[in-house]
């Protein structure tokens, strides 16, 4: 996590320096607005917000605006559209779901530099993407389980939000390995939407009814 946060801070600083250099060529000191659209609120994302605030402190003519959508796609779309209407100088987005893509596209098409963080969109209309290789994460987990589980083992896959790119890519990577390993199999997939409460809910529901036994639980969360 710290590596991704530092990379994001460095990327923001580099973009700021580029904008400041362009500004200094004509002798004027412009006021820059950086907008951040967070899909949700948690300790991890608050740490990210803190890192961005630190980066912004290096420049007294930089204003940082942070909004959280609390896992509401409609709200995040509205927040991104408002940022675009305000013609912010830089937009950083952690998309809640891939369905948020049109709003990001609209901002990018207005000429606003866009950094996508943590989760991908459906298009390539962004300036930079910072995130994990989620397909490789799923592949690595599949290969590890295939090497340590006994033949005939059954796996319960606890997935993240079905419309978020990390869940989609981790599932693709994991399932691609299992498909080639006849010694292990996935008996069921549950979707917990990246929340602790959701994970408890779906697993408790499974265990309260007759279910096919499993030897291992693979959860998408990191």
Q: Where do the protein language model's features map onto the residues?
A:
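Bacterial N-terminal signal peptides
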Residues: 11-19
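A residue-level marker of the well-folded mature domains of exported/periplasmic proteins
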Residues: 21-222
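Bacterial N-terminal signal peptides that target proteins for export
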Residues: 2-12
